[in-house]
């Protein structure tokens, strides 16, 4: 009887480790107070999709979590900044706009803005099995977390 209680958790452990629950952060002003963070959640190990969330934060003033829908575990998420200071988030063909003044502004875009996407700041992507933010730096990128 005691052996059964030990074997059951050991059999369940590999199933739980297959789930994705991680995140990476883009530090806007090179500070931890003003950031965009991407969170990936895969609550069911057999599901091939992950739920994507964007956390917009300018501490201590505001912080909000917005849903970006679903994606694959290796989906790339691009971050652009327009001259007004707003950010355009691109997940595949889907685009969203958000801001960090109140952290409340968030909307899905049906098409690329007429004035353009703005400056590419970097991309959230999986490298060596880990979600990282790869900052766009004058033609060459460097991985940061």
Question: What would you call each of these model-derived segments?
Answer:
Residues 34-38, 79, 124:
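Broad, structure-driven detector of short, well-ordered beta-strand segments within folded domains
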Residues 46-104:
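Mature extracytoplasmic domains of secretory-pathway proteins
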Residues 1-19:
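Sec-dependent bacterial lipoprotein signal peptides
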Residues 2, 26, 64, 122-124, ...:
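Hydrophobic transmembrane signal anchors and adjacent membrane-proximal interface regions, especially
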Residues 14, 18-69:
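N-terminal export/targeting and maturation segments
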Residues 82-145:
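Acidic, small-residue rich beta-repeat scaffolds with periodic aromatic anchors
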Residues 21-27, 70-82, 116-123:
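Repeated scaffold domains used in trafficking and secretory/extracellular systems
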């Amino acid at each position: 009887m005691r052996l059964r209680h030990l074997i059951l958790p050991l059999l369940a452990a590999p199933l739980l480790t297959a789930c994705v629950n991680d995140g990476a952060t883009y530090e806007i002003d090179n500070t931890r107070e003003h950031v965009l963070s991407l969170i990936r959640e895969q609550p069911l190990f057999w599901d091939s999709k992950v739920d994507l969330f964007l956390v917009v934060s300018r501490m201590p003033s505001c912080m909000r979590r917005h849903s970006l829908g679903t994606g694959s575990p290796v989906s790339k998420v691009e971050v652009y900044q327009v001259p007004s200071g707003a950010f355009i988030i691109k997940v595949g063909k889907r685009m969203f706009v958000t801001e960090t003044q109140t952290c409340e502004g968030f909307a899905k875009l049906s098409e690329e803005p007429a004035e353009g996407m703005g400056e590419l700041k970097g991309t959230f992507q999986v490298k060596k099995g880990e979600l990282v933010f790869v900052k766009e730096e004058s033609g060459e990128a460097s991985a940061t977390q």
